[in-house]
């Protein structure tokens, strides 16, 4: 089930946020997992405090076994960003990639963070005997006590089809790259690099929107790494419903993209 970020302002502008009541689907215990990209992709906005509080309340009061997987790759582009993992550490598996922030896309330099005490391990421990027997058979070549294996260790083994667990993980060049990137960030006490990246992203975003003639409302939750533009919203504001109908019946979104690419060669 997909939950769409369809909330809009009274003036008809997108906020690219979820409707809080739409999150109530997560209250159903039959919903086992929630996958979140925060900040989002492609709109590139972080969750509001209200949405974060709603998720926390749902987990604590309605669905305590909800497994949350959050991709926080764009987090560094929002000052004072706070991850779902900070609010619900035991329920959350956090994925973070170095690639966007350090311009190393393609290398797949990423880490997975999981709290030592987590719902994933708890759910495995509470599986029925038949399922546990299946898992013992699957991971039996790795441990004499499969029942004590952590979820994250099982996941690493699964990445190499279990049998090749001894080759799991990134190769040395990728490990060294991540070590250097992380060390660089820790040593940059003044966040000089981060400020430079924020200025670069914001200048690119401004250049895009200035040339569209559209208005980009201020929003402290905007990462700005990507931008999603609803052409029909602006068509309606500038030219009315008849023009919107003409656009929808005459063109498709790719026409705009290809024309933009052609005219900027």
Region locations from a protein language model:
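PLP-dependent class I/II
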Residues: 1-265
């Amino acid at each position: 089930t997909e939950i769409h970020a369809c909330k809009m302002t009274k003036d008809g502008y997108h906020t690219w946020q979820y409707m809080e009541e739409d999150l109530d689907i997560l209250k159903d215990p039959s919903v086992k997992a929630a996958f979140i990209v925060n900040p989002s992709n492609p709109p590139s906005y972080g969750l509001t405090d209200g949405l974060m509080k709603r998720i926390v309340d749902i987990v604590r009061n309605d669905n305590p076994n909800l497994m949350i997987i959050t991709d926080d790759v764009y987090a560094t582009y929002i000052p004072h960003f706070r991850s779902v993992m900070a609010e619900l550490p035991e329920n959350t598996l956090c994925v973070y990639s170095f690639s966007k922030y350090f311009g190393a896309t393609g290398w797949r330099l990423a880490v997975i963070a999981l709290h030592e005490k987590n719902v994933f391990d708890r759910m495995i421990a509470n599986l029925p005997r038949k399922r546990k027997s299946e898992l013992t058979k699957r991971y039996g070549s790795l441990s004499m006590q499969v029942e004590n294996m952590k979820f994250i260790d099982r996941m690493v083994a699964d990445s190499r089809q279990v049998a090749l667990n001894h080759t799991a993980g990134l190769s040395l060049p990728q490990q060294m790259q991540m070590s250097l990137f992380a060390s660089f960030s820790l040593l940059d006490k003044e966040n000089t690099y981060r400020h430079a990246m924020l200025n670069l992203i914001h200048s690119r975003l401004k250049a895009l929107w200035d040339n569209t003639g559209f208005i980009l409302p201020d929003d402290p939750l905007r990462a700005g790494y990507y931008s999603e533009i609803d052409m029909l919203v602006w068509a309606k504001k500038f030219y009315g419903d008849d023009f919107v109908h003409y656009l929808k019946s005459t063109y498709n979104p790719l026409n705009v993209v290809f024309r933009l690419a052609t005219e900027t060669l």
